């Protein structure tokens, strides 16, 4: 993610993410699911569709094939899309990177607003296609957004008859 890797071509970026996702699925996700453990994942195959497909404009068929190979077809039961206008999301990401010392991971943050709008549009297209998506308004304080997420999770669990 280091901006120093600016010469990394989009297809190589896609392959690196697919390889990382494959390793993550094999080492972490599948063993946990096999033990009946719930898995929460910050970004998964939808991020590849949005960033490398929408943002980088790589062919969706290629991305779908790589995602399927990397995860053995694993799909989440629920996907939370924390949505913000592009400018606000980018401002927050840059601020977070500066605050936690990961400003060197700013490759995506250095992209154009048009890139980020394509990413957001791609996420919205996924949300319209897949019923597992719940869109959460991410504007407001951390506490406000957390409350919105809590309500979505409560509804999701109630729909499945799960009580915690």
Language model features with spans:
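ATP-dependent small-molecule kinase phosphotransfer cores
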Residues: 1-71
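Short beta->alpha linker loops
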Residues: 20, 44, 84-85, 140-141
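Alpha-helix boundary/capping detector
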Residues: 22, 26, 43, 77, ...
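Short, polar/charged, Gly/Pro-enriched helix-capping and turn/loop motifs at alpha-helix termini
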Residues: 31, 39, 77, 159-164
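Short loop/turn elements that form and flank the Walker-type P-loop nucleotide-binding site
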Residues: 34-35, 74-76, 129
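Hydrophobic/aromatic beta-strand patches that form the interior of the parallel beta-sheet core
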Residues: 40, 78-80, 134-136
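A glycine- and Lys/Arg-enriched "phosphate-lid" helix/loop adjacent to the NTP-binding pocket
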Residues: 48-120
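NTP-dependent small-molecule kinase module
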Residues: 87-164
